[in-house]
């Protein structure tokens, strides 16, 4: 019993040393508000399919920050326009007028050398 009473007295001392804050007064008008604005989030219904190590298919759906989503969209639009422009250049045929006159001259000299 004496041991139980000593444990109780120790816990009572700890409670006495840690008083609870019981301030019911409203916050003052000049107190600093350290809260930050809430970031807007968007729910994406699109699933990202990932194959797990165990062979199960996992679809991730969920929330994404609006600013991150908009940044990714701008980035994808930018890269899509770059890819489209580079494809046009790569698939375009070279016009004969675009050829260098020196290259044409060398080709003619090479053909003339083969004929003689």
UniProtKB/Swiss-Prot annotation:
It is found in: Nucleus. Keywords: Nucleus. One of its GO terms (biological process) is DNA repair. Residues 1-40, 70-116 are annotated as: Disordered. The keyword Nucleus applies. It comes from the Eukaryota. GO terms for cellular component: Ino80 complex; nucleus. Residues 1-15 have a biased composition (Low complexity). Residues 84-108 have a biased composition (Basic and acidic residues). Component of the chromatin-remodeling INO80 complex, at least composed of ARP4, ARP5, ARP8, RVB1, RVB2, TAF14, NHP10, IES1, IES3, IES4, IES6, ACT1, IES2, IES5 and INO80. Present with 538 molecules/cell in log phase SD medium. This is Ino eighty subunit 4. It comes from Saccharomyces cerevisiae (strain ATCC 204508 / S288c) (Baker's yeast). The lineage of its organism: Eukaryota, Fungi, Dikarya, Ascomycota, Saccharomycotina. The gene is IES4.
